[in-house]
């Protein structure tokens, strides 16, 4: 029989119960028993939603209090020694690995965090050593599976496959071949399968997303040997791939001794014919035809026609599913009561997407007429979106068509600009700054909420925001920071804020998705041509600058990041949408400069995450991404200093594109990786200024002054003294004021020590084992 199934469901809860519960636990307000009870309730709710929609096989093990990769590391005992020594409680150990701090007060340096493939979800990076051991360590998966079975759900446990798990981890200490760990790891996977089999499970979903990447030959070979060795203990294995095409990994994937294969049709429709021709006759094919990463309604008529053609070849060996886990979309469109009715009809969130998969499955089982009403209603929605006048703006399209190369060049090269900027800004050696946001207290969040709900008027809102800006400026001046920010109290999110002010973009009320841990974001929906009617940030920056003689940065989110962290229209190339956003930002940048703002930051933390997963497609993306940044930033005078910020980036393979952005200063996340990221600059002489993140803002742990100095000295191996900035890793929005003030105070003290040590009149007065880079 054709089955409808799902690869994973959002964890956060319809009302973000996960976030509220886990943060209450971190604060010591609830017990671990209460935490686990909430996990049970959230999972039962998720399973019920899917079962009622018509999903046949329900994913189990997709829930996590922080991250599924972290869960897998803990499950197989890949717990770094620094955590084992501090904590015997497995739940607190997990939180300590993620945050550097556990609810019981234990602190140490957190594990590294990075982006999950090309999504905006973050995972905790497993750490492996040459003497790494593994053992079955956590029974959460078995408890969840048993719970699902006891509640009469047909459970399909989901785990990250052994090769993807190793690939996504990093070697700690000396480098070595991670494949050597398979011999110790596979017996633990076998234990997992044995226990699942003993519970009476029929199918297990093993995720191996790295099969859509460019894999070295030894990793390709490792797939064959690994899956030949794995003992599934009579479980049927569905091997799940997603986010791209199998391409050169297709042949080996079809050879693996598994019972079924899931492919991402939405991201890689061209692979379907090759898959059908190579799939062994006995294997199931799960077609991910519902987009798990975007919010547009599926064209059910078109999808059903495609699936009917596949069914004619495969018969009952066809399964229907979303393209990937629905972790990346909001939970329920029914919770949106303020969206425009026509716009809302074009969308589908997780609850609606599993229903779409079930509709299509019923159509395959029982014939088109069985879902005739759904098909007719869906067809009307598809036509509505295609013909709506709100999609296209002739003025925007005309402006985009008139863009020339000249608009994407600064007046002079950076060396000339730097001299002018140095004269104007009068900055010291090792200038200090922050990335943008400052702590957002409950009072600020309530203020914005009351304003949106009409409970307070414009005048009171303006007064309160100005008070907050004045306080933030005063704190920075007192701390001794060199280039200031206004703190962004008016912004709930760095992308959503601009989404609210740009035409062609819709904002939801409850469209939350998980970014990392308990942090959730509400991505805007880009449904049409994007334009700016009026200045978006000008009044707040002008006010902030009026309070101090020090430079205050104008703060904008870049075109690629707005694109990456939004749900984007799928009826035109993403590059075209990015160009429209860049033009809107260019107008804002020029307005800021005209008002006297001397430093403007255009954040692009998503620049690298948007890279296609296959290198063959990189060049095209990098060309339009660089052009869009330059289009947004190059309309200013030499004296205006352009900053950009990037997170979680490995620069080695795109360093030339980073340089091509031609930002005067780039700040980057680097503290969790202990400045390893700066190795990118060993062979490439990056010409502009750099501010490597000098402490980790994602952890509540406050670094010592000596730690900050040590990281700065490491950075000087790669960055000339006169080009090094001192700053945190990222914005400070998620931290509290006590942590923030103390951490920034220590950062400023470290910068002062460095200036004294490296002043031209004196020999360095701190013990430096590392030699600074030359100019």
UniProtKB/Swiss-Prot annotation:
5-methyltetrahydropteroyltri-L-glutamate binds at residues 16-19, 115, 519-520, 565, 609. SUPFAM superfamilies: UROD/MetE-like. Binds 1 zinc ion per subunit. L-methionine binds at residues 435-437, 488, 603. Catalyzes the transfer of a methyl group from 5-methyltetrahydrofolate to homocysteine resulting in methionine formation. L-homocysteine binds at residues 435-437, 488, 603. It catalyses: 5-methyltetrahydropteroyltri-L-glutamate + L-homocysteine = tetrahydropteroyltri-L-glutamate + L-methionine. This is 5-methyltetrahydropteroyltriglutamate--homocysteine methyltransferase. Keywords: Amino-acid biosynthesis, Metal-binding, Methionine biosynthesis, Methyltransferase, Repeat, Transferase, Zinc. GO terms for molecular function: 5-methyltetrahydropteroyltriglutamate-homocysteine S-methyltransferase activity; zinc ion binding. The active site is at residue 698. InterPro entries: Cbl-indep_Met_Synth_N, Cobalamin-indep_Met_synthase, Met_Synth_C/arc, UROD/MetE-like_sf. GO terms for biological process: methionine biosynthetic process; methylation. Its cofactor is Zn(2+). The keyword Zinc applies. Zn(2+) binds at residues 645, 647, 669, 730. It comes from the Bacteria. Belongs to the vitamin-B12 independent methionine synthase family. Its EC number is 2.1.1.14. The gene is metE. Pathway: Amino-acid biosynthesis; L-methionine biosynthesis via de novo pathway; L-methionine from L-homocysteine (MetE route): step 1/1.
